[in-house]
């Protein structure tokens, strides 16, 4: 029996969220927030945390700095029973941090990558990652040192019998290159949102994007916001509407 249900390698940071900022934010003015939250951030860490909370055995490899941000983030994962025993520490870079500014409309999301950008294949214990049924990767484009090696990593894990899922998240450079098309050929489950699906397939038509991507992976799940989600597998498509809720805070909702 594998040691874990799911292993992951990815970024770890905290989110600093400022609420209630004015809708207009002129420069060089001292603007007041009505509230503040410091929470576990990063797509990879949030996914690991939530999978463990739902009962999955999760092993997570990440990289932190020698700072309180890294210690706090790791403690949040340990509190959810995520195994972080293979975490490495950067001697020179700090743990990353994301600042979210909410001010009545679309949020501003500002990220300092820190040591998440330097994690490479050399920092990963492959035997540890192989000790699972499934491997998940998030935030493809944030892993700057790992990006040229992701296809190699996927091949190594697939050869050990693991299935692979990928949630690309956004590309800050908005180029959507960096070997992503090669990596997609090695993915079993792809989970983009609508914009990401269009970028990955080179079209502005979401239905065309879904059709194109569904031929490349065993299971495609497109997150469609208020419209719910669409899943395609084996040529069959199922769309599920979103549950009607009062939006309190979308941070970390995927």
Briefly describe each language-model feature range:
Residues 134-208, 226-229:
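Conserved beta-alpha-beta core of the PfkB/ribokinase-like small-molecule kinase fold
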Residues 58, 84, 164-165, 220:
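Hydrophobic beta-strand scaffold residues
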Residues 1-63, 68-79, 247-248:
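Glycine-rich phosphate/adenosyl-contacting loop at the front of the ribokinase-like
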Residues 49, 97-101, 108, 228-232:
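Short beta-strand scaffold segments in enzyme catalytic cores
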């Amino acid at each position: 029996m594998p040691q874990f249900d799911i292993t992951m390698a990815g970024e770890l940071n905290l989110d600093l969220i400022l609420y209630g900022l004015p809708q207009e934010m002129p420069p060089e003015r001292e603007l007041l927030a009505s509230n503040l939250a410091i929470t576990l951030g990063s797509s990879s860490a949030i996914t690991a945390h939530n999978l463990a909370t739902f009962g999955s055995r999760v092993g997570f490899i990440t990289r932190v700095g020698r700072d309180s941000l890294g210690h706090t983030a790791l403690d949040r994962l340990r509190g959810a029973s995520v195994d972080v025993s293979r975490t490495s520490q950067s001697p020179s870079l700090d743990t990353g941090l994301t600042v979210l500014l909410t001010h009545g409309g679309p949020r501003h999301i500002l990220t300092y990558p820190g040591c998440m950008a330097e994690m490479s294949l050399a920092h990963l214990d492959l035997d540890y990652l192989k000790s699972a049924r499934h491997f998940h990767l998030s935030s493809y484009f944030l892993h700057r040192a790992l990006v040229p090696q992701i296809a190699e990593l996927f091949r190594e894990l697939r050869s050990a019998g693991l299935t692979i899922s990928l949630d690309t998240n956004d590309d800050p450079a908005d180029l959507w290159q960096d070997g992503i098309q090669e990596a997609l050929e090695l993915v079993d489950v792809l989970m983009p949102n609508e914009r990401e699906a269009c970028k990955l397939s080179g079209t502005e038509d979401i239905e065309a994007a879904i059709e194109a991507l569904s031929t490349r992976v065993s299971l495609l799940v497109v997150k469609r916001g208020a419209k719910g989600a669409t899943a395609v597998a084996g040529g069959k498509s199922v769309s599920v509407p979103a549950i009607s809720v009062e939006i309190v805070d979308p941070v970390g909702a995927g």
